UniProtKB/Swiss-Prot annotation:
The gene is pyrC. Homodimer. This is Dihydroorotase. It comes from Yersinia pseudotuberculosis serotype O:3 (strain YPIII). Zn(2+) 2 binds at K103, H140, H178. GO terms for biological process: 'de novo' pyrimidine nucleobase biosynthetic process; 'de novo' UMP biosynthetic process. One of its GO terms (cellular component) is cytosol. Pathway: Pyrimidine metabolism; UMP biosynthesis via de novo pathway; (S)-dihydroorotate from bicarbonate: step 3/3. Gene3D superfamilies: Metal-dependent hydrolases. Substrate binds at H19, L20, R21, N45, H140, L223, H255, A267. Its EC number is 3.5.2.3. It catalyses: (S)-dihydroorotate + H2O = N-carbamoyl-L-aspartate + H(+). One of its GO terms (molecular function) is dihydroorotase activity.
């Protein structure tokens, strides 16, 4: 029997999908990311979305001001696509190095997406320009038609929206974000070098039974919602395959405790404090630790055309106890896997 590894050294990872929020929440949650990750693709869905170069620069300044001393962290800013976004603003932001990518939220698909796009073909001129300049398109892949069941919205999005976009703009770099279904995993595997996908720790570790059987667990509620076990297993198989189309994107999305534990709770899982140990645990369960570094630190930079990080992080086989709550002023945030112990810890 092969001895279990006691340490894992990998290049410092990046998080290719995160919500850092703003103000007190930003300063509370950012250190959990900046301590471990070198870079992160920062989502633009603030209450006032990031739609201009000026607002992206201002937000980046606020993020950098919240980075603790001793942490080396680069936020990669994104532009929130709207029905009326000026193509010149998008182009200028990308060419100046302010925008790393642009984010497509179908209107009302998730938190703070009311400003999102209601008529996707109407913004095809933006996609045409993005294809021309090599700017990646990041997609929250769910249809928002009220007649479509919430568990079917990702699969329906592939046929109705994503495939037509890829047919019309074959060299547009697209990240199918936080995929949750076998349909999406198979679609990405069958794609080409212009299509990638991020996968969250919660969608690899849990399915909808974990969220709903024996009581509702609001801290597992996120969008896209957890699916049935067959979809979870397909995601696990996809990342274990070693395919370079899949890369780390936590979709860490904090909300104050009272906004999660309510009669109409918010969607989002705050997984940043345990993200890397959680991914390591999954890859070990799948006998795929040989692919962990590529998933966490190599595939994303390759897709974005960015250099990989020079330094390394070390994971050690030391039990890691996730706190029950994290203080947030007079409130708190409940982290992913609260009160649970993981097998791996990041060496500090």
């Amino acid at each position: 029997m092969t001895a279990q590894p006691q340490t894992l050294k990998i290049r410092r990872p990046d998080d290719w999908h995160i919500h850092l929020r703003d103000d007190e929440m930003l300063s509370t949650v950012l250190p959990y990311t900046s301590e471990v990750f070198a870079r992160a693709i920062v989502m633009p869905n603030l209450a006032q979305p990031i739609t201009t170069v000026a607002s992206a620069i201002a937000y980046r300044v606020r993020i950098l001001a919240a980075v603790p001393v001793g942490h080396k962290f680069t936020p990669l800013m994104t532009c929130y696509l709207t029905n009326s976004l000026d193509v010149k603003e998008l182009t200028t932001g990308f060419e100046q190095g302010v925008f790393t990518a642009a984010k497509l939220y179908p209107a009302n698909a998730t938190t703070n997406s009311t400003h999102g796009v209601s008529d996707i073909p109407a913004i095809y001129p933006l996609f045409e320009q993005m294809q021309k300049i090599g700017m990646p398109l990041l997609i929250h892949g769910e249809v928002t038609d009220a007649a479509v069941d919430i568990f079917d919205r990702e699969a329906r999005f592939i046929d109705q929206i994503l495939e037509p976009i890829r047919q019309k703009f074959p060299e547009l770099k697209i990240v199918f974000e936080h995929i949750t279904t076998k349909d999406a995993a198979d679609y990405v595997l069958a794609g080409n070098r212009f299509l990638g996908a991020t996968v969250t720790p919660q969608h690899l570790m849990f399915n909808r039974n974990h969220m709903l059987v024996g009581g509702i667990r609001p801290h597992l509620f996120c969008l896209p919602i957890l699916k049935r076990s067959t979809h979870q297993q397909a995601l696990r198989a996809a990342v274990a395959s070693g395919s370079d189309r899949f890369f780390l994107g936590t979709d860490s999305a904090p909300h104050a405790k009272h906004r999660k534990e309510s009669s109409c709770g918010c969607a989002g899982v705050f997984n940043a404090p345990a993200a890397l140990p959680a991914y390591a645990s999954v890859f070990e369960e799948l006998n795929a630790l040989q692919h962990l570094e590529a998933f966490c630190a190599l595939n994303g930079p390759r897709f974005y055309g960015l250099p990989v990080n020079d330094d390394v992080v070390e994971l050690v086989r030391t039990p890691f106890l996730q706190p029950e709550e994290i203080p947030l002023g007079n409130e708190s945030v409940i982290p992913f896997l609260a009160g649970q112990t993981l097998n791996w810890s990041v060496k500090r």
